[in-house]
Curated annotation (Swiss-Prot):
Cofactor binding comment, as recorded: Binds 1 [4Fe-4S] cluster per subunit. The cluster is chelated by three Cys residues, the fourth Fe has a free coordination site that may bind a sulfur atom transferred from the persulfide of IscS.
Organism: Acidovorax ebreus (strain TPSY)
Coiled-coil segments: none
NCBIfam families: PRK10696.1
Annotated residues for binding of [4Fe-4S] cluster: 140, 143, 231
Gene Ontology terms for molecular function: 4 iron, 4 sulfur cluster binding; ATP binding; magnesium ion binding; sulfurtransferase activity; tRNA binding
Membrane-crossing residue ranges in chain numbering: none
EC number: 2.8.1.-
Protein name, UniProt field: tRNA-cytidine(32) 2-sulfurtransferase
Taxonomic lineage: Bacteria, Pseudomonadati, Pseudomonadota, Betaproteobacteria, Burkholderiales
Cofactor: Mg(2+); [4Fe-4S] cluster
Chemical reaction(s) catalysed: cytidine(32) in tRNA + S-sulfanyl-L-cysteinyl-[cysteine desulfurase] + AH2 + ATP = 2-thiocytidine(32) in tRNA + L-cysteinyl-[cysteine desulfurase] + A + AMP + diphosphate + H(+)
Keywords (A to Z) from UniProt: 4Fe-4S, ATP-binding, Cytoplasm, Iron, Iron-sulfur, Magnesium, Metal-binding, Nucleotide-binding, RNA-binding, Transferase, tRNA processing, tRNA-binding
Protein family: Belongs to the TtcA family.
Role this protein plays: Catalyzes the ATP-dependent 2-thiolation of cytidine in position 32 of tRNA, to form 2-thiocytidine (s(2)C32). The sulfur atoms are provided by the cysteine/cysteine desulfurase (IscS) system.
Amino acid sequence: MNTANNTLPTAADWAGEDGAPDAADTRKIERESHKLEKRLCREVGRAITDFNMIEEGDKIMVCMSGGKDSYTLLDILRKLQKRAPVKFDIVAVNLDQKQPGFPEHVLPDYFKSIGVQYHIENQDTYSVVKRVVPEGKTTCSLCSRLRRAILYKVADDLGCTKLALGHHRDDIVATLMLNMFYGGRMKGMPPKLVSDDGKHVVIRPLCYVPEKDTARWAQYQQFPIIPCNLCGSQDGLQRVAVNEMLREWDKKFPGRIESMLRAMGHVVTTHLMDPHLHDFKNAKATGIADPNGDMAFDHEEFPVAPALPGLQVVQLG
């Protein structure tokens, strides 16, 4: 455990079907589940370390929607809590927005079954949104703002130092693409940020985790999933289209989504076009060699993407 002299913990410190399956199938499922658990703990631990998400004495408010991602986040954080190099508390929080058909017993029953501290906040934002937003318009934007304000207040009331959200790797890359395609800006989801009111720290411990892993873990653990579209509103067709594009891309070109995520952490501001990040107007030749300077006329070489299985070209002779 690497906590001496206020040294930040390392990633190693953190990561310390139908019908009844037969014995062989059961063993295979157990092996796959164990491997996935280790991978999830490793990736979440790495994110916590890389961005100093959780510190000694923190009280983490895990925002629970009842979807696969928030269940996975809570489960993995509780596993890490038992062997983490720092001591921290967890409280699971759900905002019941009084959407018609919301199964309000599901989350409290689950929280009680695992013995986690929890809080259910009852606020009828559904009626507010329906009253304010014209019929046929998406309610997601207003609903999100109301939810954010309420959760910040709950964090204050509970004495929480951090709010943990369940956004995963694919959410972050999709948001970057959405902003590029429809917003004309390069903006994704940060792994850690100070809230817009300046009073709260928000963390995304699943930022390195692909969605397929949270889906698989939810399946293994048989979490009581609550549908995400009870209100009948959808967050526009743009996100649906981008998510589908990324899924197809990942099938055809494995590893590209991971590469895009890495790119968000390796930004070369001199090779973009934002004058606020680089002073292009006053760029002048100095006569001094710069190893980081632009090779303006050179063709940039990129690593060859791995071919899909079965598509490799075999050369004979």
